[in-house]
């Protein structure tokens, strides 16, 4: 907060801010005078009324250096108080900071403390809000002291009395009223604020605390203990915040100018009676202004109206008291005053809020001025308007360098005007500022020369809203241009997410030397080439540039001058420029420089062989010796721009290759060279895109001839499926799923063929194919729609939860080139519109997610180099993930610090010693070493630094490939990295124009690579069946869940890939088989789970009764009956129960095997039917989500994980390892028991109808789900502990980003957020600490509390100790040992003691919203959500904000404690001479240690 220099109320060097309830003395001490009249300004003179709400005497003059009556004008009278009007001569800015007050006729209760939940006053007095309300609003009397009459009448303290009861006692005991108020015998009962004030004043907090703790320990009633705990929290808060009154020396208060401290200015802690006010502060008039409008009317702040109501009612009440009005009238007036004050403080909480006359909206009270987006916190303190800024439309500037931007002259002269004026005056071109301004207005030519010199070397900042990550603001060197639009470099568009369809950008001028330095060194666009979220380049050429480079480096057989031999690159360029050599010709060039490892194979050598052998042999030898290079003319031209260090790039350059090159360059040769390379390839790309003249015509989209054949086949297949359905062998659900699969496959085949057709057209020079293959524009999906078939369309749903609609089973067979039929067009519009409307709706959700992430992580800053932890995170090589295209093992370990030695288990060689950073090269080695199965790395999740995190646990800063520096705001970077791509996570906007993608449910699983088959936990049966053609087929059917097939490398025995085999799968391989790539391993039914007979016998139905537990549905089309198990609860009486199951009995009638049948199962056997192993007895349909991924996809899923919400239908999870058995069945649930070898048993109740995954006798591990449904993160935390839940959350969120959006986010960003979600613990037993049971506190606070009692003991018997030592007290062990030594010497009885008990707790997983609200910083939490609640709680507890995070420092106007704003940098002072580097390092280390000590002290 910046105050004027006149009376600086807040010194700039404060380090913390304390919140407490203002005492009546402090309200008066801050006030400059009492506001007595409700008037604001005089209607004729428009000057403030004296003693009114705008009074100059109280708040200061309305004009600089001029008093109200005009006696004193000019600055020379500064500080004089006018003897006529009493106004001090000073600047008008004091009207922004001087406060007044209103002295109330009766005490009034502060609405925040009475209406907050739980009510603070209610908790202290043990009264409900309803009862409090009746007392405060003058409906009932409350007994303050029962006295003698109370004892006789059986009335206790705090009893409520009606008016009749009260007057009855008063009249009955008239004499009693003559006693002194302090006499304990006097009966006292009051109402309103006065009563509450007296009750709070007489409270014994210490007594209450003892009593409540006793209830907590001894009470058996859960409700009583919960109430006591709620009250104890408030009592303890007051006890801790109250400090004995102490007078503060005048000097030390820093709140007022020296000569102006009111004498009774006393600083003290909170007393409960302060929640009742005797005077109300009046905020400075400039903060509630009166603004004149045209037509003589005034616009006023709502606060003035609210204050006016209070003053009018207060003055009227004073008058009524003076004239001794009847009690009824007084009571009504007092109630109205209480209501007026309530409305002033918080108008939105009341049901009958005070409204304005004309528009009938509720008036904005003081609370509303703080709350929400338009409140003081978010509007003026976190987001401020800035000067020296401008905005304009952007256009592309292809000729700019990467670090430049084009700034229109008219904008530049406005922005840099003060500097230009100074330069003009200095050089004597203008005599004064005024004349300089005139020159500028006339646009004199000399002005432009001066402007050029002024802006030289002065960067400007460009920003495009929304600023989703730090690359949304970058610095550029401006170059002056004509016109009115800002020009920006095409390569920075990706970072800004800018395009040139009318986007606007803002320009800001960094003014101070430090700001300019930071802009040039840290923010210049040529230094920001890498994305902090993934470590991948962001300045990647796109569109025309990529197309140009691709066209340039492609080869075309039969080009002019093909297979020529050249002795230098220069010769090649000359021949090409002379027109003797085609751009795409394959040629041989003598070259002895470095070569890039990867290259394309070119065929020119084969052509030479066809021509003759001598030349061929010589060339072959030269190529082998690497003195000759087979390449193309275009690639020689391209390599002119490539730095020598990288070598000669002999590949077709598409977007992927360009990205990889830029990444390599930035890490190998640094940013300067990379920026130069980027500028060069930009030029080359644009030039050859123009030369190639590439454009798309209708004839470029080629439809494959085989399309009709494939469509016929698909129609045949779908007819076959319908026939099977008609025969009754398929359910309707299976028919639908199989038809969708048929079309999905066909669509993919046609798409692939159309792609291949394009590829072959014109030797790969089809413009459409080139745009697609280079990555310049378009995707395979779009080509499929243009030249293949549009395929299946998803039917949009209304739901906003992110659930996709199902797929329409009739596909769109036409493609866009052929044109759609009317019906097909109608179907596709539906999906396309849904996509567009989703896009606009989801943006707000993504923005809100980003905001919550920022709030939860904003105070995570790197504060130390090494926390010294011994724990790490195990990262395992996951074969399934690697082959399914998820993040590779090397990506997960790259840039981390090894917690333990990483070594090759086969050779025993150490690859990375503990404490070393795993670089890109080392990660590559580890990835290729089969002997490394896992690596233990340092992680943010296991970091043990108390404040912030340490740089070794974080690892490298992804954008600079170096270990992160102390002071880096990694929390904010993490929030930006997750929030920015969040916008791309649509509510699965059905991709291109609503076509459905994804979910082909594969029936066959094929080998990903070759190797030897190995079975793991697989149980099978053999089954012979006769197929449609009447031939007998043998099948091996899996009858165990979660069996695995491993493909093993024959030489090393290493598992290359692991496949989970579902129950009921048909195996196509046996253990020990050698398989080839793409060989079928097993086939399975993807749309249902099967119940399969495992033995020979006869089926017997149990509890399967027609009309009760199953229904018979006859399909109208096929005439076949289908038996489906139904929910039977509604069919039976409350006491009855059923458990449908299939039993297999042997010849003697003994039950051999029982299978429970869940609701919705379809039966495939009759009662009494004979079965053999492998027969399908029933199928349980699976709820397949056909539009890819999980049911809730994309953004809603990410939000669900970050908020740690319990899923809607969570799985029941076992808490112990053991064996499953089924217990009794109740009406609505059945028992599942898990028993382990030690006899421990857990019982779980499962809702009837929920599908149970475990069978009788199955072995299960702790944390394994027993039923279907999503596993709740809270369960994982409870059963498997914090590490497991952290890993689970990181992996699940990563999956959504990877699979749904293909976005790469480094794990460490997610870890930072997840760490914040697990920062709190809940106290179970407080032991001998000062904590309360059920308290939710920071882990560091908990450890500190335990540390405090670790050296203390509890006295069990005091013996002959001195009187200060009493039983049951806590004392230091050292002190007691010393006393016992003395007692032993004197042969007296020793003190008996036992160690103090430490508190116990369990970790709590909070969602990001709760975690942000639970932050230690009051200011940060208040600016996030629930402002009034946060401030009320903070004031009661007397909380101190240590200003540790970023947000709170921005709000109080200090430098943020990150980067150069860290404490350790402030400690360093540079002398006249340069400090030696080692000295500077030592000073920094010392400063850091000092900062840590201070942090610990605080």
UniProtKB/Swiss-Prot annotation:
Pfam families: RNA_pol_Rpb1_1, RNA_pol_Rpb1_2, RNA_pol_Rpb1_3, RNA_pol_Rpb1_4, RNA_pol_Rpb1_5. Its EC number is 2.7.7.6. One of its GO terms (cellular component) is DNA-directed RNA polymerase complex. SMART domains: RPOLA_N. Binds 1 Mg(2+) ion per subunit. GO terms for biological process: DNA-templated transcription. Its cofactor is Mg(2+); Zn(2+). Transmembrane segments: none annotated. The keyword Zinc applies. It catalyses: RNA(n) + a ribonucleoside 5'-triphosphate = RNA(n+1) + diphosphate. GO terms for molecular function: DNA binding; DNA-directed RNA polymerase activity; magnesium ion binding; zinc ion binding. Zn(2+) 1 binds at residues 67, 69, 82, 85. Keywords: DNA-directed RNA polymerase, Magnesium, Metal-binding, Nucleotidyltransferase, Transcription, Transferase, Zinc. SUPFAM superfamilies: beta and beta-prime subunits of DNA dependent RNA-polymerase. NCBIfam families: rpoC_TIGR. The RNAP catalytic core consists of 2 alpha, 1 beta, 1 beta' and 1 omega subunit. When a sigma factor is associated with the core the holoenzyme is formed, which can initiate transcription. Belongs to the RNA polymerase beta' chain family. DNA-dependent RNA polymerase catalyzes the transcription of DNA into RNA using the four ribonucleoside triphosphates as substrates. This is DNA-directed RNA polymerase subunit beta'. The gene is rpoC.
